[in-house]
Amino acid sequence: MKQETNKFIAYLAIIATPFALGAFFLAWSPAQQFSNEDPSSDGYVPPRSIERLVERTQESTVTVWCEPKGEKFSQGTAWAIELEKDATKEFPTVLITNHHVIDTCIGKGDVITVALPFEDPVAAELVRWDAENDLAVLRTTLKLPALGLSEYDTYPGYWVMALGSADGYEGSVAFGNVINSNRTEILVTNNISSGSSGGALVDNEGNVVGVMTWSLDEQQYNGAVSLNAFCVKILECKYEIKGEKTWWDYEE
């Protein structure tokens, strides 16, 4: 009887082992996806904590108002970037937005303000701009943490998040995927609206890959300016392809 019992237990162990191993790998594999810091390996999956990513990005994102006297005002989004050469004691935080958000304020004096969600607007200065690539640099009296810049180019299918002030709703979030990209533009499925312009497009690590810039009502995609476009007038870039500076290294 004891021998038969031992055989039965061994039989159960043989049956149970594959199921146990399967459960282990199902639990282990997703964890390994998120443990890889390189988006080129895991950039297709959402972050483990979307809530934490949203909160961290919101801390560095503001609404921008351009209100020239006697003219129609415009509204957009900006986000903090680390550009020490443009920061001052009075204006310690440097921001990136779109040129078209502030273009009517150029040469009009102190008519640009920014604000964190649901807080009062504060002064901002226009530092410089790149009209061709639709980028502008501001600085503000607010003290905000800078967002990191991604070390990796985007690929079709990558998970991305856009955060801004869609139609004036501050702190709006839109999730989506990269459809495709070229050297300076990224096509995404994220839903954006007027007011989202200038907002950061971040990967699943919370690092910026581009700036939300335009939308097409008749199409199912929207567009962002990639970090490569920053190399013209915004950032000092050390890489180059076909005679043009790039933020990402395409020769690796």
Q: What is the meaning of each model-derived region?
A:
Residues 28-54, 208-252:
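C-terminal cap/linker of serine protease catalytic domains
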Residues 44-45, 52-53, 79-80, 84-86, ...:
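Active-site substrate-binding loop(s) of clan PA
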Residues 104, 145-185, 189-196, 212-223:
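Flexible, gly/ser-rich surface segments that form the specificity/activation loops bordering the active-site cleft
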